[in-house]
UniProtKB/Swiss-Prot annotation:
InterPro entries: Ribosomal_bL36, Ribosomal_bL36_sp. PANTHER family: 50S RIBOSOMAL PROTEIN L36, CHLOROPLASTIC, LARGE RIBOSOMAL SUBUNIT PROTEIN BL36C. The lineage of its organism: Bacteria, Pseudomonadati, Campylobacterota, Epsilonproteobacteria, Campylobacterales. It comes from the Bacteria. It comes from Helicobacter pylori (strain Shi470). The keyword Ribosomal protein applies. The gene is rpmJ. One of its GO terms (biological process) is translation. This is Large ribosomal subunit protein bL36. The keyword Ligase does not apply.
């Protein structure tokens, strides 16, 4: 899980979702998981 100021899709499988006001990226590749913090 990477915490960064701007989240971007890193591949085609990445999905940007909003959970409890937090923007997250979920992906099949664990390395691509991100959240905005």
């Amino acid at each position: 899980m990477k915490v960064r100021p701007s989240v971007k899709k890193m591949c085609d499988k990445c999905k940007i979702i909003k959970r409890r006001g937090v923007i997250r990226v979920i992906c099949a590749t664990p390395k691509h998981k991100q959240r905005q913090g």
